[in-house]
Curated annotation (Swiss-Prot):
Active site, per annotation: E243, C277
Species of the source: Shewanella pealeana (strain ATCC 700345 / ANG-SQ1)
GO biological process: arginine catabolic process to glutamate; arginine catabolic process to succinate
Coiled coil: none
Name of the protein in question: N-succinylglutamate 5-semialdehyde dehydrogenase
Keywords: Arginine metabolism, NAD, Oxidoreductase
NAD in keyword set: yes
Membrane-crossing residue ranges in chain numbering: none
Length: 486
């Protein structure tokens, strides 16, 4: 019983699917997919529940959301372990994800009041009142890299605003989604307010195409996001929020503490086995002795990165990629870059057949003319040597994406120069570019999104503004308009 529809756990009626631990290939979850017909039932359940959920009022909705927060707190160790087993990420990292899920509640409440909520002002024309109302039924598509935290960042603000939700998680991380819904159930969520449909492409297509959803919130690949954007292009009445990937640049310029710089480069490129949408994919290092020395330190440090299963002791820095298929894809990406003229400074290798375990890779692609503008979603960092700061910024901007970017530089003037010219929604200075605050918006431009930043700004796409001019009774104005006699 792995579909949660109208407040009940039911069996999927589609084909059988399994979820495996990518570090050892053990099956940790199996069930059947939701059929398009079951997706329709889930949407109907959300539609039937939506008005009553909205009319409960914010305080009553908040009480249930806070009860969910308490369930997360009580079960955070289990949540972290399930995420670790299903994604292959090491336990230290999934503990931070479980913690972020808890922290998202307070941030979402603050965002609701600051970004939406209700306000009023007296004007000569009457009382001007600004309110926000929910869109209705929204679909949430979750990714596999942060299977708890990222969909949580859509679901919580959507519910606070008064929407109901149909949640379709990644088919690679169904067990995390199942645990999330069990905690919502324990929190006392009314039936139909969240509905979980587990499945693969057929399930997702049925949900995205359903005429009764009022919005879709997606986190995932640029390819899928662009398909959804095309699908919704002729339907302006539906809100679409896309958070996609990036081919993210990191520039190094005149840094005295090279050891700290190497640390921030590694945290930017290799955390989560390179499976964060904000991970650095391109590293720009100045030509000359200083750049040579930094690269030498980086090569040595990358070779020392510990890789291992989610539960290895002592804990590794990098766990498994999400699947053996993903691991093989990174080996192939490296091979393609070498064939184009790249030089592997540290070779990315598939460490164990049948698993997603790979070693981190570092490849010098300086001078490669036809460098693909691709998001290689794994631990492979491309190095480009530059002679001129303007050249480095120009190369950094030479991408259709625009999610994250950063510079490590001791000079504030260099940062200001970079900040004014770089094209990205997240721009960091002397910090890893995978570091983002839930108290700030999260999103990018270009192929990285559709101008619907998430995190603190998720409240913006979960409700629409309603402007009213009000008076307690009808009354004649002191002076009638010319030409009127009443």
């Amino acid at each position: 019983m792995t579909q949660f529809i109208e407040g009940k756990w039911v069996e999927g009626l589609g084909h059988e699917v399994t979820s495996i631990n990518p570090a050892n290939q053990k099956v940790i979850w199996n069930s059947k997919t939701a059929t398009p017909e079951q997706v329709g039932v889930a949407v109907d359940a959300a539609r039937n529940a939506q008005f009553d959920w909205f009319m409960l009022g914010f305080d009553a909705r908040l009480a249930i959301v806070e009860a969910y927060r308490d369930q997360l707190e009580a079960n955070k160790a289990e949540m972290a372990e399930v995420i670790a087993q299903e994604t292959g990420k090491p336990q230290w990292e999934t503990a931070t994800e479980a913690g972020a899920m808890i922290g998202k509640i307070g941030l979402s409440v603050a965002a609701y009041h600051k970004r939406t909520g209700t306000s009023e002002n007296d004007t000569p024309a009457g009382r001007a009142v600004l309110r926000h109302k929910p869109h209705g039924v929204v679909a949430v598509f979750g990714p596999y890299n942060f299977p708890g935290h990222l969909p949580n960042g859509h679901i919580v603000p959507a519910l606070l605003a008064g929407n109901t939700v149909v949640f379709k998680p990644s088919e690679l991380t169904p067990k995390v989604a199942e645990l999330m819904l069990k905690l919502w159930e324990k929190a006392g969520l009314p039936k139909g307010v969240i509905n979980l449909v587990q499945g693969e492409v057929e399930t997702g297509k049925a949900l995205a195409a359903h005429p009764q959803i009022d919005g879709l919130f997606f986190t995932g690949s640029s390819r899928t996001g662009h398909i959804l954007h095309q699908q919704y292009a002729g339907d302006p009445g539906k809100i679409l929020a896309l958070e996609m990937g990036g081919n993210n640049p990191l520039i190094i310029k005149d840094v005295a503490d090279t050891k700290a710089a190497v640390h921030d480069i590694i945290q930017s490129a290799y955390i989560s086995a390179g499976q964060r949408c904000t991970c650095a994919r391109r590293l720009y290092v100045e030509k000359g002795a200083a750049g040579d020395a930094l690269l030498e330190q980086l090569v040595a440090a990358v070779k020392q990165i510990q890789v291992g299963p989610w539960n290895a002791q002592p804990q590794p820095f990098m766990g498994s990629m999400i699947s053996e298929t993903a691991a093989k894809g990174m080996v192939e990406a490296q091979r393609n870059l070498v064939n184009l003229g790249g030089n592997a400074l540290v070779e990315l290798t598939h460490l164990e057949v049948g698993t997603g375990l790979v070693s981190p890779g570092l490849i010098d692609v300086t001078g490669v003319i036809e460098l693909p503008d691709e998001e290689y979603f794994g631990p492979l960092l491309q190095v480009v040597r530059y002679s001129d700061f303007d050249e480095a910024i120009k190369l950094a901007n030479a991408t259709r994406y625009g999610l994250s970017a950063g510079i490590l530089a001791d000079s504030r003037e260099d940062y200001d120069y970079f900040l004014a010219r770089i094209r990205a929604g997240i721009v960091n200075w002397n910090k890893q570019i995978t570091g983002a605050s839930g108290a700030a918006p999260f999103g990018g431009v270009g192929a990285s999104g559709n101008h619907r930043a998430s995190a603190f700004y998720a409240a913006d796409y979960c409700a629409y503004p309603v402007a009213s001019v009000e008076a307690d009774a009808v009354s004649l104005p002191a002076t009638l308009s010319p030409g009127l006699s009443i």
